């Protein structure tokens, strides 16, 4: 056998096997597709295990990988929250005593809601124990001691086999969990002031609060151009809803990392979003005609002119998402885990 032919066997044998405990539950039909695709993309040398507090406290693993750590500290009831926070403190003591490295993915610069001083203190402790950070866009500020850039993967493969909807001319779409920071209330107010009869607005997603549900239902009752599907929707339904629109509208009050934006691009739909450094980087990455950015107020004048602008913009058949392919993302995560353990990360590549 030639030396080149034997190289893959040598590399595979040299790749250290490691066990990674993820802070999320075992994937199911309702799991965020980002997580499901990440777990599927990990190389065979990574043995994934999924979170329970019992597993985290009593078992052995090489690395703890945290996504959205605030959710480990929260419960609908006050007593449940106290219990989860007490268990989390025990876990952090264990990690500190055993020297188990923590890897943390920065999905947000900070939690969207502030849940009090105990949560803030525990999150600071987690920060202190984090040995490597993963930022999913290159504009996120780096954090000590080490930060790795692994771009958020696309959803193109995830939706490839799902039926696409027929485009409804003039339809605008806002989708995802309906939360106050996403600007839905502003979008509804602006839509009432838009005079263009070609435009309609579709809201798809589960309201985070009863107040948000009432807000959307009232707008639908008052304006026949506005319709909504207010529920958690399965992915085939979501694929049809997204592909049926001409433009996805995301008037977020704050926007740094957005899986919603990438999901829309994965289904080849143009997006209107506020200017931010991260959104500008994505707009440049994917090519012209896919991401339209605005600065200042989101208002009727802006929304009224968007349909003609989107239709006139030159664009390719699909946005360029080649930097976000999952096999490479899995290998880069493996490298981060090895380096968190003080091993040679090049063994992963």
From Swiss-Prot:
It catalyses: beta-D-GlcA-(1->2)-alpha-D-Man-(1->3)-beta-D-Glc-(1->4)-alpha-D-Glc-di-trans,octa-cis-undecaprenyl diphosphate + GDP-alpha-D-mannose = beta-D-Man-(1->4)-beta-D-GlcA-(1->2)-alpha-D-Man-(1->3)-beta-D-Glc-(1->4)-alpha-D-Glc-di-trans,octa-cis-undecaprenyl diphosphate + GDP + H(+). GO terms for cellular component: plasma membrane. Keywords: Carbohydrate metabolism, Cell inner membrane, Cell membrane, Glycosyltransferase, Membrane, Signal, Transferase. Belongs to the glycosyltransferase 94 family. Its main location: membrane. Pfam families: Glyco_trans_1_4. Coiled coil: none annotated. The lineage of its organism: Bacteria, Pseudomonadati, Pseudomonadota, Gammaproteobacteria, Lysobacterales. GO terms for molecular function: glycosyltransferase activity. It is found in: Cell inner membrane. Its EC number is 2.4.1.251. Pathway: Glycan biosynthesis; xanthan biosynthesis. Residues 1-14 form the signal peptide. Transmembrane segments: none annotated. This is GDP-mannose:glycolipid 4-beta-D-mannosyltransferase. Nonprocessive beta-mannosyltransferase that catalyzes the transfer of a mannose residue from GDP-mannose to glucuronic acid-beta-1,2-mannose-alpha-1,3-glucose-beta-1,4-glucose-PP-polyisoprenyl to form the lipid-linked pentasaccharide repeating unit of xanthan, Man-GlcA-Man-Glc(2)-PP-Pol. Is involved in the biosynthesis of the exopolysaccharide xanthan.
């Amino acid at each position: 056998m030639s030396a080149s032919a034997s190289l893959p066997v040598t590399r595979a044998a040299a790749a250290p096997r490691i066990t990674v405990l993820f802070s999320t539950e075992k994937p199911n039909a309702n799991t965020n597709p980002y997580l499901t695709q990440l777990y599927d993309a990990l190389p065979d040398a990574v043995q994934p295990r999924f979170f329970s507090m019992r597993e985290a406290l009593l078992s052995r693993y090489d690395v703890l990988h945290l996504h959205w750590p605030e959710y480990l500290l929260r419960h609908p009831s006050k007593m449940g929250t106290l219990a989860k926070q007490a268990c989390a403190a025990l876990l952090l003591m264990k990690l500190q005593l055993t020297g188990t490295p923590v890897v943390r993915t920065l999905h947000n610069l900070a939690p969207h809601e502030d849940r009090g001083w105990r949560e803030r203190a525990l999150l600071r402790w987690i920060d202190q124990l984090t040995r490597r950070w993963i930022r999913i866009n290159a504009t996120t500020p780096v954090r000590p001691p080490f930060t790795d850039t692994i771009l958020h993967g696309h959803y193109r493969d995830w939706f490839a086999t799902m039926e696409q909807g027929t485009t409804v001319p003039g339809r605008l779409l806002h989708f995802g969990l309906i939360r106050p920071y996403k600007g839905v209330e502003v979008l509804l107010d602006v839509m009432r002031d838009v005079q263009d009869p070609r435009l309609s607005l579709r809201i798809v997603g589960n309201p985070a609060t009863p107040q948000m549900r009432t807000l959307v239902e009232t707008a639908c009752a008052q304006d026949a151009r506005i319709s909504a599907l207010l529920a958690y929707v399965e992915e085939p339904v979501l694929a049809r809803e997204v592909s049926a629109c001409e433009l996805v509208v995301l008037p977020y009050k704050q926007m740094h990392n957005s899986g919603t934006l990438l999901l829309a691009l994965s289904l080849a739909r143009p997006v209107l979003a506020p200017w931010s450094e991260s959104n500008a980087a994505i707009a440049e990455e994917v090519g012209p005609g896919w991401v339209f950015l605005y600065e200042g107020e989101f208002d009727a004048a802006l929304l009224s002119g968007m349909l003609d602008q989107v239709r006139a913009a030159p664009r390719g058949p699909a946005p360029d998402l080649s930097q976000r392919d999952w096999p490479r993302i899995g290998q880069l995560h493996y490298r981060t885990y090895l380096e968190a353990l003080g091993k040679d990360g090049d063994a992963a590549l």
